[in-house]
Amino acid sequence: MTERFKNWKYPIIKERKMTKYNWVVQNSKHLKLGYKTDIGAFTYINAKNGVVIEDHVQIGSHCSIYSISTIDGKEGPVVLKKNAHLGSHSIVLPGVTIGENSIIGAFSLVKKNIPANCIAFGIPAKVIKRLKRQ
């Protein structure tokens, strides 16, 4: 987290419009974006029921984060805790919390909560390793 975020600024978010970093938020008034977050290009966030992205979270490109599902009607806030990492092309479904310092591998489908300090991946994402706290 050194030089990469040296000049970090809160992005300008307009409803259903791409940010200058090429990601988009629907229902942006329900998005809480932490300090020094990194959201990859072509990521889609639907924050209708709340999305919280805490400090130092990194989200890869082409991810989708949903707080509502029109297919099964499931709704619920999504929380990405401090220093969580979401690999590119991953999907997070409604009501999920990804714990602090956890890492989600690329192309994963996160349907259930992931505890802090874990590595998880797959369809559906499963914890494969617990990380040692430093």
Kindly give the residue locations of the regions a language model identified.
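Domain-scale signature associated with acetyltransferase and cell-envelope carbohydrate enzymes
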Residues: 1-73, 77-83, 89-92, 100, ...
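Conserved coupling/switch loop of ABC ATPases
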Residues: 94, 112
